[in-house]
Amino acid sequence: MAYRKLGRTSSQRKAMLRDLTTDLLINESIVTTEARAKEIRKTVEKMITLGKRGDLHARRQAAAFVRNEIASENYDEATDKYTSTTALQKLFSEIAPRYAERNGGYTRILKTESRRGDAAPMAIIELV
């Protein structure tokens, strides 16, 4: 089996994977179900590999998948302006250089206790 269906149609599944991948790149750690964590591991690894390549084509490929969300906002008192960093900028400027010497294995999945409502196996996925 090449992928998990996760009980959704293909468009819903792709949207969910894009959202979770973007959230992981922004927050660097999220809590989700084990099945979802194992699926987004694949996409996050691909995005970080694209970030390490760093050329224009890699940036465009990553931009086609990662949502255009603000990762952080800073206020500069000298210029009296706010500067914001998107998830894509964070991927290429902060996350990718951190793994320059590492060949794969950028994420870690830690199993936690089951969810209370439906006993779904939960996991924390984080960037190493």
Swiss-Prot record:
Gene3D superfamilies (UniProt xref): Ribosomal protein L17
InterPro entries noted in UniProt: Ribosomal_bL17 (IPR000456), Ribosomal_bL17_CS (IPR047859), Ribosomal_bL17_sf (IPR036373)
Tree of life domain: Bacteria
Keyword list, A-Z: Ribonucleoprotein, Ribosomal protein
GO biological process: translation
Entry keyword annotation includes Aminoacyl-tRNA synthetase: no
UniProt-recorded Gene Ontology molecular function terms: structural constituent of ribosome
Stored Pfam families: Ribosomal_L17
Cellular compartments per GO CC: cytosolic large ribosomal subunit
NCBIfam families with a match to the protein in the record: L17
Subunit structure: Part of the 50S ribosomal subunit. Contacts protein L32.
Family to which this protein belongs: Belongs to the bacterial ribosomal protein bL17 family.
Protein name: Large ribosomal subunit protein bL17
Record gene name: rplQ
